[in-house]
């Protein structure tokens, strides 16, 4: 080993993915409706879903990652794994909702899904029609 590489651990995540606190996050710029984006994530590997976000720290790391990925492009909203089921919001990976960052408390009734809002630097969420086509972020446990 070269001295500069001692103590450096190889990332368990694929090249170009974010490695954060035991999870891998991949950004996909091709725009899909929410259900197709979720299917894309599920097809990547077992346990992969549209990203669930459970803390402000995790949210900031993802927002920085998405901003870097979209650098030089027109910023666009990005799907995360939250969607409205009847009156409740639920994560696509089945995890409990312990954190939220909605841009406001007014929700439209109907078939809505959550996206990181481009105009906030991806630091707030917006409810968007699930049929809208957005870029998306996938997550799996490393």
Curated annotation (Swiss-Prot):
Keyword Amino-acid biosynthesis: no
Cellular compartments per GO CC: extracellular region
Keywords for this protein: Disulfide bond, Extracellular matrix, Lectin, Secreted
C-type lectin domain span: 20-139
Compartment(s) of residence: Secreted, Extracellular space, Extracellular matrix
A single GO molecular function term of this UniProt record: carbohydrate binding
PANTHER family in the cross-refs: MANNOSE, PHOSPHOLIPASE, LECTIN RECEPTOR RELATED
Protein name per UniProt: Dromaiocalcin-1
Organism: Dromaius novaehollandiae (Emu)
Lineage: Eukaryota, Metazoa, Chordata, Craniata, Vertebrata
């Amino acid at each position: 080993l070269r001295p500069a590489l001692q103590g450096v651990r190889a990332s368990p995540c694929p090249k170009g993915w974010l490695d954060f606190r035991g999870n891998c996050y991949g950004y996909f710029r091709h725009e899909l409706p929410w259900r197709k984006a979720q299917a894309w994530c599920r097809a990547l590997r077992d346990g992969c879903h549209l990203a669930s976000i459970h803390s402000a720290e995790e949210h900031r790391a993802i927002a920085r990652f998405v901003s870097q990925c979209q650098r030089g492009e027109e910023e666009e909203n990005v799907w995360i794994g939250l969607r409205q089921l009847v009156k409740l919001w639920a994560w696509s990976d089945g995890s409990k909702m312990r954190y939220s960052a909605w841009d406001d408390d007014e929700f439209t009734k109907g078939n809505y899904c959550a996206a990181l809002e481009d105009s906030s630097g991806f630091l707030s969420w917006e409810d968007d029609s699930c049929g809208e086509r957005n870029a998306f972020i996938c997550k799996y446990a490393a």
